Design a protein with these regions (language model features):
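Conserved donor-binding/catalytic core segment of Leloir-type glycosyltransferases
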Residues: 245-262, 268-271, 286
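A short, well-ordered alpha-helix in the C-terminal region of glycosyltransferases
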Residues: 388, 395, 402-416, 423-429, ...
Length: 441
C-alpha cells in the first residue's frame, strides 16, 4: 500500500503523537509498504530513528506570522526562503516562548478555516508542493492509495489535499480534545463548530482507543461506519522485561509531560500521605518528562510542597529522557503512576512501563480501563483522589508478589496487544476499508 502521512512537529519536545506517527510509518516501511511521512509546522523530534522526509510544509514560522500581520500573507519570496531555511526552522524549534492563549486560539480557528483562513498562502504552497511531488518526482509515479492527517486540528487541510491528489483522506484522532478543552472562549466553541462542519471533507477517521472513538462520535456526530479504532503500539526493541527484584529504596515513578493536567501534583500528595499516615518508608518519588517553560513554576511548587512536608530529599526530577535513558529509568522503578486529571485517550507511558515489566496504578478514566483490561498490568483507582491512589500504592508496596505478577502480565499483554506490528496491521485494515468505501461510493 502507498501511504502519504502527515505528522505535526512539536518543536523541541518529544511529542507522543509524533512518536506514534513515526513508529507507525517505520513499521509499515519495514513490512514493505511505501510510506512518505511529511512533517508540518516544524521538523519532528523522535526518540527512535526518524523516518520523516527532510522537508517541512505549512512552516510554523510563516503560519504564526500570517496570523499576526497582513503583510506576511502576501508572497515575499526572499522572506519565505528565509523562513523555510533548515537552520531557521531548527532555531525556531529550539526556542522556548511563553504561549499567548489569545494568539493560540485565534490561530487554531484560522487553520481550521482552511483556505478561508489567514494561512491561505501556506496552503497554496502545500498544494503546489503536492502537485509537483505527484507529477514530477520519478519516485512517485503513482499517487498514494490514502492520505492521513495526524489530528482533527488540521482538518482544514483535508479539502485542498483531496483536491490536489484526488485520493481518500483519513484523519487520525489522538488526543487533541485536551488541547481544545484548554482553549479560551470563543475559540473553543468556534474550533469545534468548524471541525463538525468539515467532517465530510474526510473519508474516514482513526481513533487511538475505543474511549477516544466514542468521545468523538458523540462530540462531532461522526457516523460509526466512518470511525475505526487503531490502538497505540510501541517498538519493543530494548525492553527486556526481566525478572524484577525489589529496589532499595522503593521507587515510585512518573513518566510524562510535566503539566498540571498530567497529575504529578496528585502523585506527590499521595506520596506525602503515605509517608505521614503509614509505615511506608525507604522510598523515593522519581519523575521524568518534558517540561515547558510555562510549567516550570508548577514543578517548583511540587518541589516546594515536598520540601515543606519534610520529604524534599525523596523527590527527584530527571528531565526529558531519550529512548535509552527512558528504558533505563523504567527499569529502575517498582511501580509507575501518571494520575491524569482529565480523560486521557492514549496512555503511551503505560505501554512503555508495562513493556519493561513495571506495574502501573492509574485513575479509572479515559483509555486507562481498556488498556489495563487488555494487558492486565496494573490497578485502577478513583480519579482525582490522592487517598485512593495512596491506598493502591501502599497495597502494592506491601505485596511484592502481586507487583511481580502485574509486571509479568503487563509485559506479556503489551507484547500480545500493543506492539508496533499490531498497530501497523490494524492501521492497514482501517486504511483499506476507507479506500474501499470511497471506491464503492
Amino acid at each position: 500500500m502507498k501511504i502519504l502521512a502527515f505528522t505535526a512537529g512539536a518543536a523541541k519536545m518529544y511529542c507522543g503523537s509524533c512518536l506514534r506517527d513515526n513508529a507507525l510509518a517505520a513499521e509499515l516501511k519495514r513490512q514493505g509498504h511505501d510510506v512518505i511521512l511529511l512533517p508540518l509546522y516544524t521538523p519532528t523530534r523522535t526518540d527512535e530513528s526518524n523516518v520523516s522526509e527532510p522537508v517541512v510544509l505549512m512552516n510554523g514560522i510563516s503560519v504564526c506570522l500570517d496570523q499576526q500581520a497582513a503583510f506576511f500573507r502576501k508572497t515575499h519570496r526572499l522572506l519565505d526562503r528565509l523562513w523555510d531555511a533548515p537552520w531557521m526552522l531548527k532555531l525556531a524549534s529550539q526556542t522556548s516562548l511563553e504561549v499567548d492563549p489569545h494568539l493560540l486560539g485565534a490561530m487554531t480557528v484560522s487553520m481550521l478555516r482552511g483556505e478561508d483562513g489567514f494561512q491561505l498562502k501556506e496552503i497554496r504552497k502545500l498544494r503546489e508542493w503536492l502537485e509537483h511531488w505527484l507529477w514530477h518526482e520519478p519516485r512517485h509515479e503513482l499517487p498514494p492509495d490514502v492520505v492521513t492527517l495526524p489530528n482533527s486540528l488540521l482538518i482544514g487541510l483535508a479539502r485542498p489535499i483531496r483536491q490536489a491528489l484526488q485520493r481518500p483522506v483519513c484523519c487520525t484522532l489522538q488526543g487533541e480534545e485536551i488541547f481544545l478543552r484548554q482553549l479560551q472562549e470563543p475559540y473553543r466553541r468556534q474550533a469545534l463548530e468548524l471541525i463538525r462542519a468539515k467532517i465530510h471533507d474526510v473519508d474516514g477517521f482513526v481513533a487511538v482507543s475505543h474511549y477516544s472513538a466514542g468521545y468523538w462520535i458523540r462530540e462531532l456526530g461522526i457516523a460509526e461506519n466512518h470511525m475505526h479504532v487503531v490502538p497505540l503500539g510501541i517498538n519493543l526493541e530494548g525492553y527486556a522485561a526481566l525478572e524484577r527484584a525489589p529496589h532499595q529504596p522503593f521507587r515510585v515513578g512518573y513518566l510524562a509531560r510535566v503539566a498540571p493536567e498530567k497529575g504529578l501534583h496528585v502523585l506527590a500528595e499521595s506520596y506525602i500521605r503515605l509517608r505521614r499516615e503509614t509505615e511506608f518508608s525507604g522510598a523515593v518519588l522519581q519523575a521524568a518528562g518534558y517540561l515547558a517553560q510555562e510549567h516550570r513554576a508548577y514543578l517548583r511548587g511540587i518541589e516546594r510542597h515536598m520540601k515543606d512536608a519534610g520529604f524534599g530529599a525523596e523527590f527527584h526530577y530527571h528531565g526529558e529522557l531519550d529512548h535509552a535513558r527512558k528504558i533505563e529509568f523504567l527499569n529502575s522503578l517498582d511501580l509507575l503512576s501518571v494520575p491524569c486529571t482529565y480523560d486521557e485517550p492514549k496512555g503511551i507511558f503505560l505501554l512503555e512501563a508495562m513493556a519493561a515489566g513495571v506495574p502501573v496504578v492509574q485513575p479509572r478514566r479515559g483509555a486507562f480501563p481498556e488498556i489495563l483490561a487488555q494487558s492486565g498490568g496494573g490497578v485502577l483507582v478513583e480519579p482525582d483522589n490522592p487517598a485512593s491512589l495512596a491506598d493502591a500504592i501502599y497495597r502494592l508496596w506491601k505485596a511484592p508478589e502481586e507487583r511481580a505478577e502485574l509486571g509479568r502480565r503487563g509485559a506479556e499483554g503489551v507484547r500480545a496487544h500493543y506492539s508496533v506490528s499490531r498497530m501497523a496491521g490494524r492501521a492497514l485494515e482501517a486504511y483499506e476499508k476507507i479506500v474501499a468505501s470511497v471506491a464503492h461510493a
